[in-house]
Amino acid sequence: MADTSLMPIPGQVDPVPAPRDITPRADGRVDLMGLPKARIQELFAEAGLDAKQAKLRSKQVYHWLYHRGVTDFEAMTDIAKTMRPWLAERFIVGRPNVVEAQHSTDGTRKWLLQTDDGHDFEMVFIPDADRGTLCVSSQVGCTLNCRFCHTGTMRLVRNLTPGEIVGQVMLARDALGEWPKGRMDGLDDVEDTGHYSADGRLLTNIVMMGMGEPLYNFDNVRDALKLVMDGEGLALSKRRITLSTSGVVPMMERCGEEIGVNLAVSLHAVTKDIRDEIVPINKKYGIEELLQACADYPGASNARRITFEYVMLKDKNDTDEHARELVRLLKQYNLPAKVNLIPFNPWPGAAYECSTPERIRAFSNIVFEGGISAPVRTPRGRDIDAACGQLKTAAQKKSRAERDREAAAEAEAAASQA
């Protein structure tokens, strides 16, 4: 029987609880991905293990899942051989399904992923000289309708579960060979040459800046990030994780208290009229209310500054006056801030153009002169539509039937050569 647990589905600006059917696996097994150790222990007890065995086995399985990236119970060598088939009959360690993997000329990688119930979403890995950043999605689609963002042209399909969110991190580590036994079969689609941190990790940072508004899927995002930050699991420091919001003000304090990661705010305009147009949530939570929530954000300090994202749109939000007003607002609220200036990344049908390089530099200089760091973000992955604001699932760009025809043609060609 389908589980009809509540899932928050945001309307135009605020989440509204709404039921949705969760289709169980056809084989009846329970996916452990995205579950904390305590829940795994409960499931093992419900499946018939006594309390002592449930506690021991959950600790072992949790370690293999999140610390070593193992998906096959037979590979969990410190678990009794007789126990491994018992686990495999009842449980599974899932990953998002990979539909397509793309590699940009600048090293950026994008994966088109699919949930078990057939919904597509994307994640992006961006390598730099001293770090490797994974851009993670929180929803399939989005409701915020930001005018400059390709994802904003999609309807919201559903929230991603904790397993589907943390599964993106697991999948990226699979592909990058981040586990003790190296690359996972079938995922080493692109060779990487360098390591970006002292401990040899390629994936050093996570940004919740993929598809969707993370604070409209707060519980699932929180639960997933707790697994990522757990010292017995993926063990990524909260200082290396940034959550980006378009300004869901009522959830920002909880974000700081319950998750505690770095905060980024999609500001993009400094006047009500312009922000109402390009970031419609501003009609509900205005600039002043948003900036006050930033000033109150738990943990914000000069050592942990809030990042304000500002996409540069030609003749829309890029004048000297806009730059000076940005400085004034951030100083008015005494915010420990830095500003990321983002050249607009074009996509088919977009209503805007990117500001000229000269205009962007002039804007940046004014903000710098005002005492606030304002670097210009280098666009990454434009050639594979992986840059900021370009994510939109291939299901929207290319029909599934087209992809099926292409796959059938490839299979037929391979068979003819055999």
From Swiss-Prot:
Active-site residues, as the UniProt record annotates them: 122 (proton acceptor), 388 (s-methylcysteine intermediate)
Cofactor: binding details: Binds 1 [4Fe-4S] cluster. The cluster is coordinated with 3 cysteines and an exchangeable S-adenosyl-L-methionine.
Composition bias type Basic and acidic residues, residue spans: 399-408
Domain Radical SAM core: residue ranges: 128-383
Disulfide bonds: 135-388
Gene Ontology cellular component annotations, sorted alphabetically: cytoplasm
Catalysed reaction, written as an equation: adenosine(2503) in 23S rRNA + 2 reduced [2Fe-2S]-[ferredoxin] + 2 S-adenosyl-L-methionine = 2-methyladenosine(2503) in 23S rRNA + 5'-deoxyadenosine + L-methionine + 2 oxidized [2Fe-2S]-[ferredoxin] + S-adenosyl-L-homocysteine; adenosine(37) in tRNA + 2 reduced [2Fe-2S]-[ferredoxin] + 2 S-adenosyl-L-methionine = 2-methyladenosine(37) in tRNA + 5'-deoxyadenosine + L-methionine + 2 oxidized [2Fe-2S]-[ferredoxin] + S-adenosyl-L-homocysteine
Annotated PANTHER family: 23S RRNA METHYLTRANSFERASE (PTHR30544), RADICAL SAM CORE DOMAIN-CONTAINING PROTEIN (PTHR30544:SF5)
Name of protein: Dual-specificity RNA methyltransferase RlmN
